[in-house]
């Protein structure tokens, strides 16, 4: 299969200066993630302004739960992205095409499964999370409608992951912008005009997700290279499924472990009542915009590292890691400082209540300022996954981020002197320090192994060059 002659959206990750291309990849991806967050932010703002604090708490309290239920399958999309990027870097077009068709069919199966689980289990899980009784019905309704559109969500995420494997982060941005505009308009119409409350914002989100999924599928169908989607070739290739799962399941488990810990944290937040819940929900929405920058540099690091790993350029991989981490930390801390400085104004967008704004500022001061630590933790994982280390970061995350949070909340937080909301929030920076330090130590040893592979690879090439003249003489 021939490569597409139309390479406007592709980025050459194998040659040239790294930083400009890294930014060209990461900036549209950051904007794309921010647009996705605007879907949720629009939900939160419209509900907070026109439906009340109970509805705001109902929508916000679902954030961690939605992440918990979807992260395993979004991890599989990371596996598809890494595998596709390796084949792209190695110019193995037939294998890339098989990866595309396996990934799309896998996304459909994943979406259907999540829809069933989300609709049937919504109320039970929310009760387990200690969702207050006066919020429970609204939260359950929102969650069930949201998960009705999960097939479209999975389809978009897998499709966008495949496009990113070639360096194309621009078209997913355009598609999210189009669907985001529709989402905001429908939010206003359903809630203000039809008085549909949380059902309206959930329905608007589902419709917008369907639009973005349709656009990304259309894009893949119109491709002329190995990324082209042909519905007649849709099938699960067992080897490709195994390879996707080898990368994606550890990534998904890591995401689920994070989310499980966050659900536990959310349960602790819920115990302080509706005002703290609403303030925390609004602050989480702001923090997610900061995290979008971290996620962009993580995904850039994964894509660049995977392509160069496929091409065998190990020296370039080390440069990519250093530039990704430094740039990710600097830009993240800049966003963090801005979020705290303008915190009262930003939180005021979500709720007119002074008590809710004050509660949100407590969270921002204890968590947002330390997101640079999270950047180190997450971005360096991209280097490990890009060179094939998938289990290691999962185990580090299990112990450093998840176990430490659960231990803190079940021990220190339970002491009367420390049983206050600040002691819930501090668990984030503490776990980031522990996990980031461990990831850096792991990367040190992995990079030494990569150096040995480089020397062995160069020695093998030199030996082949020495043998070539002898073969010619014979």
Label every PLM stretch briefly.
Residues 1-26, 84-149, 182, 193-249, ...:
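Short alpha-helical transmembrane segments in multi-pass integral membrane proteins
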Residues 13-50, 64-79, 83, 108-115, ...:
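N-terminal transmembrane alpha-helices
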Residues 24-43, 145, 156, 179, ...:
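Transmembrane helical elements of multi-pass membrane transporters/channels
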Residues 29, 33, 45, 82, ...:
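Transmembrane alpha-helix boundary and packing residues in multipass membrane permease domains
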Residues 34, 38-57, 126-133, 189-196, ...:
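Helix-terminus/linker motif at the lipid-water interface of multi-pass membrane proteins
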Residues 51-64, 139, 143, 202, ...:
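Small-residue hotspots at the loop-to-helix junctions and early N-terminal turns
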Residues 56-116, 153-172, 279-343, 374-397, ...:
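Small-residue-rich hydrophobic transmembrane alpha-helices
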Residues 77, 145-164, 175-183, 201-216, ...:
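Short runs within selected transmembrane alpha-helices of multi-pass transporters and secretion channels
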């Amino acid at each position: 299969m021939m490569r597409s002659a139309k390479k406007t959206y592709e980025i050459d990750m194998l040659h040239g200066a790294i930083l400009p291309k890294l930014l060209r990849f990461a900036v549209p991806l950051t904007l794309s993630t921010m647009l996705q967050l605007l879907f949720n932010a629009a939900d939160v703002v419209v509900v907070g302004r026109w439906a009340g604090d109970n509805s705001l708490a109902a929508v916000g309290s679902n954030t961690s739960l939605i992440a918990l239920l979807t992260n395993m399958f979004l991890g599989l999309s990371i596996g598809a992205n890494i595998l596709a990027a390796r084949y792209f870097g190695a110019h193995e077009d037939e294998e890339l095409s098989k990866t595309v068709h396996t990934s799309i069919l896998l996304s459909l199966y994943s979406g259907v499964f999540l829809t069933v689980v989300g609709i049937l289990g919504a109320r039970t899980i929310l009760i387990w999370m200690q969702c207050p009784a006066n919020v429970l019905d609204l939260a359950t309704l929102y969650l069930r409608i949201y998960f009705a559109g999960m097939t479209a969500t999975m389809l978009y995420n897998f499709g966008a992951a495949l496009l990113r494997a070639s360096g194309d982060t621009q078209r997913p941005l355009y598609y999210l912008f189009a669907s985001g505009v529709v989402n905001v308009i429908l939010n206003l119409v359903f809630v203000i005009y039809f008085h549909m409350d949380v059902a309206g914002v959930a329905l608007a989100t589902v419709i917008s997700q369907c639009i973005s999924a349709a656009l990304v599928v259309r894009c893949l169908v119109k491709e002329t290279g190995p990324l082209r989607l042909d519905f007649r070739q849709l099938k699960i290739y067992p080897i490709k499924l195994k390879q996707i799962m080898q990368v994606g399941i550890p990534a998904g488990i890591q995401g689920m472990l994070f989310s499980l810990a966050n659900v536990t944290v959310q349960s602790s937040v819920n115990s302080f009542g509706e005002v703290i819940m609403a303030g925390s929900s609004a602050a989480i929405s702001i923090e997610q915009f900061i995290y979008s920058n971290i996620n962009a540099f993580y995904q850039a690091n994964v894509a660049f590292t995977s392509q160069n790993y496929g091409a065998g350029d190990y020296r370039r991989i080390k440069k990519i890691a250093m530039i990704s981490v430094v740039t990710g930390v600097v830009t993240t801390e800049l966003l963090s400082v801005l979020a705290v400085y303008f915190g009262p104004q930003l939180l005021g967008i979500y709720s007119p209540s002074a008590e809710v704004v004050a509660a949100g500022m407590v969270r921002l001061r204890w968590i947002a300022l330390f997101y640079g630590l999270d950047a180190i933790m997450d971005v360096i994982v991209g280097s490990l996954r890009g060179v094939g280390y998938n289990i290691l970061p999962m185990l580090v995350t299990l112990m450093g981020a998840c176990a430490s949070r659960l231990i803190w909340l079940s021990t220190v937080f339970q002491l009367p002197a420390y049983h206050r909301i600040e002691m819930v929030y501090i668990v984030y920076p503490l776990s980031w320090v522990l996990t980031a330090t461990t990831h850096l130590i792991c990367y040190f040893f992995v990079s030494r192994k990569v150096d040995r592979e480089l020397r062995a690879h160069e020695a093998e090439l030199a030996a082949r060059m020495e043998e070539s003249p002898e073969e010619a003489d014979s």
